[in-house]
From Swiss-Prot:
Cofactor: heme
Family note: Belongs to the PhsC family.
Transmembrane segments annotated in the record for this chain: 16-36, 71-91, 97-117, 169-189, 196-216
Residues involved in a menaquinone binding: 219
Keyword presence, Repeat: no
Gene (name only): phsC
Keyword Lyase included in the entry's annotation: no
PANTHER family: CYTOCHROME YDHU-RELATED (PTHR30485:SF1), NI/FE-HYDROGENASE 1 B-TYPE CYTOCHROME SUBUNIT (PTHR30485)
Pfam family, one: Ni_hydr_CYTB
Gene Ontology molecular function terms on file: electron transfer activity; heme binding; metal ion binding
Location within or outside the cell: Cell inner membrane
SUPFAM superfamilies per UniProt: Transmembrane di-heme cytochromes
Source organism (scientific name): Salmonella typhimurium (strain LT2 / SGSC1412 / ATCC 700720)
Main subcellular location of this protein, as a coarse class: membrane
Classification lineage: Bacteria, Pseudomonadati, Pseudomonadota, Gammaproteobacteria, Enterobacterales
Protein name: Thiosulfate reductase cytochrome B subunit PhsC
Amino acid sequence: MNTIWGAELHYAPDYWPLWLIYAGVVVLLMLVGLVIHALLRRMLAPKTAGGEEHRDYLYSLAIRRWHWGNALLFVLLLLSGLFGHFSLGPVALMVQVHTWCGFALLAFWVGFVLINLTTGNGRHYRVNFSGLVTRCIRQTRFYLFGIMKGEAHPFVATEQNKFNPLQQLAYLAIMYALVPLLIITGLLCLYPQVAGLGPVMLVLHMALAIIGLLFICAHLYLCTLGDTPGQIFRSMVDGYHRHRTAPRGDKSAV
């Protein structure tokens, strides 16, 4: 049993609370849904000749360093939290890794906020509410149907707006709601005497982590929706967003 941290909420392999079972089912269903979407896209999307490739420098070195550091911290936090919470492997080490990565995540989040306050990157997180519902419907339709038919993306990333409307809302929710809540609940788990709500905070912290896991799964899959599976990932290596214009007479290519 985990006697170091959250022992009263230790979950052995033969005991999972009902809410955690439901959460596991949700994660599994999401993964199945993403696999089905990928298979349908592969089978149904028409093969079109690519047009001329355009490159726009949209991701500064600071943003890319923050992104990769943040991604690494999320992975380490999820793994150390999983191993520590379920007493897999060296629990004491996992708790230490989780704690230090949590403080590092706090530093990275502060850095993210400062970047948005002091550079032009912040404009990409300012929502234009005029026609927002219509734009979200267009983007949802593209993900569900349009991409299967090889339709052009309804919102191309530009220097003025890097994100489509669904991306913008999702990133806002993650970076300005989920991450702060994860940090706050994590600190209250680390210092339970502050609020006296250790067990409650631990459950909430784990639930928020599962939401974060769902986001990561969706984010990684959506990053494969470029002209090639690795195209969008390359943008976080060299900073250039790439897209191809439709060849003349072909309105279906991206």
